[in-house]
């Protein structure tokens, strides 16, 4: 069957996002994708979450931290967080909107909120969803989600156990492995991230100059 114009356009756009190139006749046009600044949503305010938030902020993420214990999401504990939310993880869908370009890190206390977080996240769009835990804990959670009706593709989209296998044991080392995996996924396809203020100016039609840095040398 022939592709409709809509289907062809959708495929062309998808190919452009995937490869960074779109073919028009005999010409190739290079495409640069702009997205909103990435949001790092950390579910659980324990020891690992603190360095995850610190590294995430250094990497330019908007930081949201949620925990069911009020004293674990204080400004003193997470000064770098843009949002600090207290609530039962069952209320995640109510407390946290389905942001565009969201990166979820699930590190709940004793894994008690893992399933609730997973249910909510798998029902919304996400750029990344990682969950901490041993292979046994992860397997149990996966089986539970499959039994609840989530597809294998959905469950397999979870990065669990979370992080790159660098053998870290300390909270800071685990945080490095988590954020290293996130950076790896984020850079798998080149994106240019647009600050919210810049995006607002573009929408309002404000004048400006677009500059693309082609090469950096030294400590620039």
What are these model-derived regions, one by one?
Residues 1-68, 75-76, 99-103, 185-220:
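Segments forming oxygen-rich coordination pockets for charged ligands
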Residues 49-50, 113-115, 138:
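Short, well-ordered alpha-helical microsegments
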Residues 66, 103-110, 119-144:
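ADP-ribose/adenylate-binding Rossmann-like module
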Residues 72-82:
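Short loop/helix-cap segments at secondary-structure boundaries that form the rim of catalytic
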Residues 82-88:
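Conserved SAM-binding strand-loop segment of SAM-dependent methyltransferases
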Residues 90-100:
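Short amphipathic alpha-helix with an adjacent loop that forms part of the alpha/beta core around
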């Amino acid at each position: 069957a022939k592709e409709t114009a809509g289907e062809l356009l959708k495929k062309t756009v998808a190919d452009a996002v995937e490869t960074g190139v779109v073919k028009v006749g005999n010409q190739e046009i290079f495409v640069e994708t702009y997205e909103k600044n990435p949001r790092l949503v950390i579910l659980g305010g324990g020891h690992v979450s603190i360095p995850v938030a610190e590294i995430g902020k250094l990497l330019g993420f908007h930081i949201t931290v949620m925990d069911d214990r009020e004293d674990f999401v204080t400004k003193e504990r997470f000064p770098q967080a843009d949002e600090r939310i207290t609530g039962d993880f069952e209320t995640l869908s109510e407390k946290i909107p389905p942001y565009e370009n969201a990166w979820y890190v699930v590190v709940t206390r004793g894994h008690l909120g893992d399933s609730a977080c997973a249910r909510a996240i798998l029902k919304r769009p996400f750029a990344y969803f990682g969950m901490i835990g041993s292979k046994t804990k992860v397997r149990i959670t996966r089986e539970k989600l499959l039994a609840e009706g989530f597809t294998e593709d959905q469950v397999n989209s979870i990065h669990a156990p979370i992080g790159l296998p660098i053998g870290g044991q300390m909270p800071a080392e685990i945080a490095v492995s988590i954020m290293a995996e996130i950076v790896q996924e984020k850079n798998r396809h080149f994106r240019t991230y647009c600050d919210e203020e810049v995006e607002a100016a573009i929408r309002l039609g404000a004048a400006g100059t677009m500059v693309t840095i082609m090469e950096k040398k030294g400590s620039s």
